[in-house]
Amino acid sequence: METIAKHRHARSSAQKVRLVADLIRGKKVSQALETLTYTNKKAAGLVKKVLESAIANAEHNDGADIDDLKVTKIFVDEGPTMKRIMPRAKGRADRILKRSSHITVVVSDR
């Protein structure tokens, strides 16, 4: 049984979150949680929270056994980008792009 959890509008760029997502794809859930716990990146905390939510969804909604679960799919899509202006010297201005992402984790007991 596949179970999904999503975090939409996560305040980190998709490029940065994908680095962390690639670390846990295909691993057992317990091993993935341990990997994320010791990964020193902001995105690791975001992905860990979504993974824990997927585990809880599988246990509560589908009655799955946690020991059998694996991360079957994990993907990160780009979310909306907030555009901001940073004043610079001599009356100029630069555009700052504050990127966001949509994190999706799918766990399965197969």
Swiss-Prot record:
Isomerase among keywords: no
Single GO MF annotation: rRNA binding
Gene Ontology BP, a term: translation
Record InterPro entries: Ribosomal_uL22 (IPR001063), Ribosomal_uL22_bac/chlpt-type (IPR005727), Ribosomal_uL22_bac/org-type (IPR047867), Ribosomal_uL22_CS (IPR018260), Ribosomal_uL22_sf (IPR036394)
Keyword NADP recorded: no
Any Pfam family hit: Ribosomal_L22
Domain of life: Bacteria
Keywords tagged on the record: Ribonucleoprotein, Ribosomal protein, RNA-binding, rRNA-binding
Assembly, per entry: Part of the 50S ribosomal subunit.
Family label: Belongs to the universal ribosomal protein uL22 family.
Official protein name in the record: Large ribosomal subunit protein uL22
Species of origin: Photorhabdus laumondii subsp. laumondii (strain DSM 15139 / CIP 105565 / TT01) (Photorhabdus luminescens subsp. laumondii)
Upper taxonomic lineage: Bacteria, Pseudomonadati, Pseudomonadota, Gammaproteobacteria, Enterobacterales
